[in-house]
């Protein structure tokens, strides 16, 4: 009846919620690490969070379960975490409301968009309490049809960053399908480079206050911007590990403007010559060489 972002993905339900405590969640995350190779675990997604409905003073990424989520990424598993639903339109308490473990350093923290692609009023904003910009990206999380736990086969409409986060995990699964060797670092770099940049709209409403004092991108509302699944998948599939471009300041000063790039091309028939070569450094624009 309803189709998710990655309908061919295999799911593993790790029970770490919600009658227990944070230690149960951490044990579930550790189980994913320990069984990564056995079950081929590429992605972990979690929509858990510590909800305080107030400005945080301890969401600095150093809590035990935030560090555990960093360990999941360090084990080579792409990880998406919910930003939290604590904004609520509060002028003062709206900023610095990222939930733990969404304040972790290495995972991708996901904000929520409404169906009209506006930032959801409830979606938690940064900074973290150690002044890092969060979230990292925003996806649709409002009015999402999801299985109804109260029925055997029914569906119900749900809203929250808890809905946006598994959507981002589904997009990640498509990226892994395009490139089975995709690393968490590459995943995050693609988000930084290819998200659709969004402007912060205040709309004369204190509920849309600007939590980004200095940043333009990433910002504390959308992160790097709105997720672009097509661009993400295309970028993941185009990563060529035979191409190695490296440069340091001393070398650049020595050679001036005479720079050389060595690599391999593909897709052309034997005997054909390339008509154009383009180079992109980091998340910058493609430039013709």
Question: Residues of each region from the PLM?
Answer:
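Hydrolase catalytic cores
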Residues: 1, 12-18, 50, 139-217
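Subtilisin-like serine protease catalytic core
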Residues: 1-24, 37-43, 74-76, 103-107, ...
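Structural recognition of the beta-strand scaffold that forms the well-ordered cores
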Residues: 3-4, 10-15, 40-47, 71-73, ...
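Active-site-adjacent substrate-recognition loops and nearby beta-strands
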Residues: 25-29, 52-60, 82-105, 111-134, ...
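C-terminal subdomain of the subtilisin-like protease fold in secreted/lumenal serine endopeptidases
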Residues: 41-45, 177-267
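Short strand-turn-strand beta-turns centered on an Asx-Gly dipeptide
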Residues: 140, 281-283
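Solvent-exposed loop/turn segments flanking beta-strands in beta-repeat/beta-sandwich domains
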Residues: 268-281
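Short beta-strand segments within Ig-like beta-sandwich modules, predominantly Fibronectin type-III
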Residues: 286-289
């Amino acid at each position: 009846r309803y189709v998710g972002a990655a309908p061919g993905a295999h799911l593993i339900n790790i029970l770490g919620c919600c009658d227990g405590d944070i230690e149960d969640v951490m044990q579930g995350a550790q189980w994913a690490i320990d069984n990564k190779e056995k079950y081929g675990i590429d992605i972990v997604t979690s929509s858990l969070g510590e909800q305080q409905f107030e400005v945080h003073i301890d969401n600095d990424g150093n809590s035990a379960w935030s560090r555990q989520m960093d360990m999941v990424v360090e084990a080579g598993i792409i990880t998406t975490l919910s930003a939290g639903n604590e904004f609520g339109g509060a002028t003062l308490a709206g900023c610095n409301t990222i939930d733990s473990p969404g304040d972790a350093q290495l995972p991708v923290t996901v904000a929520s968009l409404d169906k009209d692609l506006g930032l959801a009023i409830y979606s938690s904003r940064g900074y973290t309490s150690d002044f890092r910009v969060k979230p990292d990206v925003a996806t649709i999380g409002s009015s999402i049809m999801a299985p109804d736990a109260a029925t055997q086969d029914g569906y119900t409409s749900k809203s929250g960053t808890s809905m946006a986060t598994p959507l981002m995990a589904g997009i990640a699964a498509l990226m892994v399908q395009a490139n089975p060797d995709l690393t968490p670092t590459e995943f995050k770099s693609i988000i930084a480079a290819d998200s659709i940049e969004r402007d912060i709209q205040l709309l004369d409403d204190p509920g849309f206050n600007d939590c980004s004092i200095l940043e333009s991108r990433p910002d504390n509302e959308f992160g790097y911007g709105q997720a672009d699944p097509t661009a993400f998948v295309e970028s993941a599939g185009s990563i060529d590990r035979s191409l190695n471009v490296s440069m340091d300041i001393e070398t650049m000063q020595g050679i001036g403007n005479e720079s050389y790039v060595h690599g391999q091309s593909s897709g052309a028939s034997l005997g054909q010559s390339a008509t154009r070569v383009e180079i992109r450094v980091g998340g910058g624009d493609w430039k013709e060489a």
